[in-house]
């Protein structure tokens, strides 16, 4: 039996591991968001015959505690789903989506759920600071941030009100529909970069998708994002790697402790 991602989804299954093991082994494709090692998960890890970690951060946390059954199986994407489009196709798509007036805009892309952990309000504040600096240095605000998310998601802030408060509504484009892979690929291609400022992130699919489209990323060095934004072989950056400015230990009843990493908006 193959299970994957957040262990909280499968507590019910591990509770009947004895019955399952009479029929088949349990293989867990696992990701954990950040330090420290979650020893409260030990009883869950014990129940698996194999733990395959999709991020190197997760592998580094789990391997020392379960060395005989922990492997690193990095996340990957099919090259026929996310890939660079021809320049003329990108230009047409950008006009079709953003309009003629924004065809030459510097364009950023943020693709995440609107949830607190993803720090969407911090993204908007940072974008405002960037626009202000653009106006100051170059005399214009010709930049657009595309946010593929639900601005009214109950798990996050009201992003429509935030953009109004910051005075940047004209510089934000919300993509709210559920889209097939082909259209998500277009969104990645019309952008100049992809941004992820999540305070802890097990992996970060959006940034991997963007790099596969040939785009640089801006990412906080936290969780699985670190291995994406910093080349582990030569230390070069695949865009801009942001060092955390502070780290908070937070938690809940289900996850008693985990670190959140934060970066100053001014960066």
Model-identified regions with their sequence ranges:
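Nucleotide-activated donor-binding/catalytic signature segment of Leloir-type glycosyltransferases, i.e.
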Residues: 19, 156-182
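Short alpha-helical donor nucleotide-sugar binding micro-motif in glycosyltransferases
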Residues: 45, 186-191
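Carbohydrate-associated surface elements
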Residues: 57, 76
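A short helix/loop element that forms part of the nucleotide-sugar donor recognition site in Leloir-type
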Residues: 83-101
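Conserved donor-binding/catalytic core segment of Leloir-type glycosyltransferases
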Residues: 99-118, 124-127, 145
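Glycosyltransferase donor-sugar binding loop
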Residues: 139-159, 177
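Aromatic "clamp/platform" in nucleotide-sugar-dependent glycosyltransferases that forms part
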Residues: 199
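Short hydrophobic beta-strand element within catalytic cores of glycosyltransferases
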Residues: 216-219, 226-230, 237-240
């Amino acid at each position: 039996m193959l299970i994957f991602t957040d262990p909280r989804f499968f507590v019910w299954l591990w509770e009947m591991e004895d019955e399952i093991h009479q029929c088949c082994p349990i293989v867990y494709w696992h990701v954990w968001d950040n330090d420290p090692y979650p020893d409260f998960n030990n009883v869950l890890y014990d129940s698996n015959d194999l733990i395959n970690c999709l991020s190197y951060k997760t592998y580094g946390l789990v391997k020392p505690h379960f060395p005989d059954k922990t492997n690193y199986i990095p996340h990957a994407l099919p090259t026929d789903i996310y890939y660079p489009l021809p320049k003329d196709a990108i230009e047409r798509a950008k006009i079709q989506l953003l309009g003629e007036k924004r065809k030459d805009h510097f364009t950023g892309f943020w693709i995440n759920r609107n949830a607190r952990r993803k720090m969407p309000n911090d993204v908007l504040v940072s974008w405002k600071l960037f626009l202000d600096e653009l106006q100051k240095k170059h005399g214009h605000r010709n930049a657009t941030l595309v946010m593929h998310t639900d601005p009214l998601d109950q798990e996050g802030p009201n992003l429509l009100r935030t953009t109004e408060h910051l005075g940047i509504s004209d510089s934000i484009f919300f993509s709210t529909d559920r889209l097939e892979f082909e259209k998500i690929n277009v969104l990645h291609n019309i952008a100049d970069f992809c941004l992820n400022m999540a305070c802890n992130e097990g992996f970060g699919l959006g940034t991997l998708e963007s790099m596969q489209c040939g785009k640089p990323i801006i990412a906080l060095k936290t969780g699985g994002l670190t291995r994406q934004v910093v080349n582990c072989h030569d230390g070069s950056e695949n865009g801009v790697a942001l060092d955390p400015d502070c780290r908070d230990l937070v938690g809940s009843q289900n996850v008693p402790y985990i670190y959140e990493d934060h970066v100053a908006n001014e960066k």
